[in-house]
Structures are given as C-alpha cells and as structure tokens.
Amino acid sequence: MSEASGRAAGNEMPAKKQKLSSDENSNPELSGDENDDSVSIESGTNTERPDTPTNAANAPGRKAWGKGKWKSKKCKYSFKCVNSLKEDHNQPLFGVQFNWHSKEGDPLVFATVGSNRVTLYECHPQGDIRLLQSYVDADADENFYTCAWTYDSNTSHPLLAVAGSRGIIRIINPITMQCIKHYVGHGNAINELKFHPRDPNLLLSVSKDHALRLWNIQTDTLVAIFGGVEGHRDEVLSADYDLLGEKIMSCGMDHSLKLWRINSLRMKTAIKESYEYNPSKTNRPFVSQKIHFPDFSTRDIHRNYVDCVRWLGDLILSKSCENAIVCWKPGKMEDDIDKIKPSESNVTILGRFDYSQCDIWYMRFSMDFWQKMLALGNQVGKLYVWDLEAEDPHKAKCTTLTYPKCASAVRQTSFSRDSSILVAVCDDATIWRWDRLR
C-alpha cells in the first residue's frame, strides 16, 4: 500500500496532497428542503457491482406489508449543500465513514474508499473539505468497497480498516501513515467491515465467500467463522453489532437475515483465548471457532438481495432493492430478543421508510451517532433523511436533499459524530457535503 506523494502539513494527522478536481460551484445556494424534483438524470448501473435481479413489484405468493407505510412529513432537520469534490480516479466511491472515536474539539475527519484508493479528508467549519492523506494499493485491480474506524488501545492512535474485491483486510495508521497489518482468509471479496462497539480490537468482516469472520487485530487472530451448514447460501452483503456488542445480524444475496450471538459461553471463551494467544510462546496455531448455526434466521422480510442492515435498539432496520427500509423484529412483538430460539419462524414488521428510484443493490443507509437520524441516497443523487425521534414510527418525518449537479448513485452516507455534517459519496467519484442548519 503506497501513499500519493506531496506536501506534508499537519495537525495531529499528517497531510499528504494529491490531485483532486473540485466542483466548480463549491458553495451552492440550494437548501436541502427545496426543489424536491430538481434531479431527473438517470444514472447507469455501475459495472463493478452487477445488476440487481428483476424486482417484480407484485411477485406472486407474497403477502402485503404487515403495517401501513411510514408516511413522510416535514422533518425538523434541515441541511444545506456547502461543498463537493471529485476524486481524480473517476471510479465509483463505495464507502465513506467519519471517525467517531475523536474527542470534542478534534478535527472532523472522514475516509472514502473507491477504486484502489483510500482517502482521508478533514471538514472545516466554513464548508471547506481539506485533503489530508491518500493511499493507493499496489494492485491496480483492487477495488475497495468498505472501511471502518477504530483506535489502537495502547497508543490511542486512530486506525482505519479497509477491504474490497481482493478479500484482503488492510489496517492503516494515519498518524504514522503506514499500512501496519493485513489479514488474508476470506476466499473472495469483502463487502463490509465493522468494529465491535465496546472492544476496539474485534473486527467483523463479511464476504462474497458466504461467511462472516471475527478477527482480533491486537493479537492478529481469527476468533471465529460464521457460516457453513445453516449459514448464508450466497454473498453476505452487510452485518451489524447491536449496541452492547452481544449480537450480530447479517444479511445477503440469499434474501435472508441471520442472528449470531457472540455473548455465548463458547464465543466469550474464544474471545478471551484470542487475547491470551502468543505465537512466540507456542508452536500451535490459534484454533478458530466454526459457527455453523445462526441463533435465528428469516427470509420473510425481503424478496431480493438484502444489502444493508443496522440495529436500532432491539429492532432491526434492513433494506433490499425494493425502495423501502423495513423496521422489524424477530419473533412476536412481545418476545424478548435474547430469548428468541433458532426454531422461531415469526417476525413482526413494524413499518417501513419509503423512498423512490433506489432499485440497484449495494446502496447503504446510515444513522448518526445517537441514532436520531437515518440517511440514504438513491441512484439519481437524491438524499433522504428521516427523523427517528418521532414517538409514533408511522409519523417518521423525512427531508429530501437534492442538488442539480448531484445526479449519480449515492453509494453510502455518513454523519459526523456531532451530527452537524452529512457526507455522501457517489458512483461518479464525487463527494457531497451537507451542513445541518437546524
């Protein structure tokens, strides 16, 4: 992994400059609440991620949604587009993540991934986006799909994990500006990376090889592999830890969502042993757990690829290529999620967030740090922001953010930790910064 050369500058994080073309209109006057229909350009399907299978609106044999639609009313949040950039590789940007491990007063830093490039930026208060560092993989055919932030538990340095089409996880230290570790094990592309909410060393990866893997990046051990007998039957596209880090929900191309508990005695022991493992004191390799059976599984929520899943308390938010994010829970409404049995066949759909023109796959939504806002972009550059604080979920309010020049598929969004900035990345290599007005 080499760096793009250039001028070093720096706060805490050294800066490396590369050529970036900036959008000529970097301070547009358009507020996100206006001109709902100003975007009308269709974007072509990106060749790097294949087409979604035909999604019939009324597939036979499927029941109608359990509850009514979550109607969108005027949202209390308002955003303004203040800046945009275009990365010079002109390839789709698949991932963006703000570093939420920074302290109050620290620079607001986010990372983007696309092509064989990983780029770090800093958001300045006046709307500027400053390029900090850029890393280029030695293999021109690498295509990074996902990134995730953590920190070194010994030095407190920020660390960034990235992965993509080659199935190699790379850990970058932006302070020393080096790729300090890499992990090989998945048999195919990696679609998402997630760090444990309470343990900065536990990294979850999900792959095209139908499996999930849990790594300990402090001791460089593979703790567990989730998949096999009752695992996913096709690419795993997304996964998320719950807030306490006791459960994982995964989803994929097999239309299924699967729950994996990592607070079982078996998994707690495996994690503990991964910390105690020292290769210099033993000739034996670390024995990874093979978890073949999920603790719950369903195919009753979606009828197409499930490409994004997130926990919201004990509820699940998931989406397919069906123009809706569905809110649901395993079992019946009154059931305790921690007592759900693997044989449970019931699911309770609580409602859905509807939007339009988003029927290609690998389009991921995000929430802010406090889980008060939900954001998703569609394939023609529109952004939808929902207010999750509404007491009645059926009254979740939505703001639609549009800007005429943003007309390409929005692959992912990310909020700054204080929720003041929303960044979106697109298939045409553009980055869009929206600042919150209220």
Swiss-Prot record:
WD repeats, residue ranges: 88-131, 139-182, 185-225, 231-270, 301-338, 356-396, 405-438
What are the alphabetically sorted keywords of the record? Answer: Chromatin regulator, Nucleus, Repeat, Repressor, Transcription, Transcription regulation, WD repeat
**CC annotations in GO:** ESC/E(Z) complex
Q: Which residues form a coiled coil?
A: none
List localization entries: Nucleus
Statement: the UniProt record of this protein carries the keyword ATP-binding? no
Q: Which Gene3D superfamilies match?
A: YVTN repeat-like/Quinoprotein amine dehydrogenase
PROSITE patterns named in the record:
WD_REPEATS_1, WD_REPEATS_2, WD_REPEATS_REGION
Region of interest called Disordered, as start-end residue ranges on this chain: 1-67
List, as start-end ranges, the regions of compositional bias called Polar residues.
Answer: 40-57
Look up the record and give one Gene Ontology term from the biological process aspect. heterochromatin formation
Q: Which SUPFAM superfamilies match?
A: WD40 repeat-like (SSF50978)
* Family in the record: Belongs to the WD repeat ESC family.
Record note on quaternary structure? Component of the prc2/eed-ezh2 complex. Interacts with yy1. Can interact with ezh2, hdac1 and taf9.
Instruction: Report the function annotation for this chain.
Output: Polycomb group (PcG) protein. Component of the prc2/eed-ezh2 complex, which methylates 'Lys-9' and 'Lys-27' of histone H3, leading to transcriptional repression of the affected target gene.
Protein's name according to its UniProt entry: Polycomb protein eed-A
Organism (species): Xenopus laevis
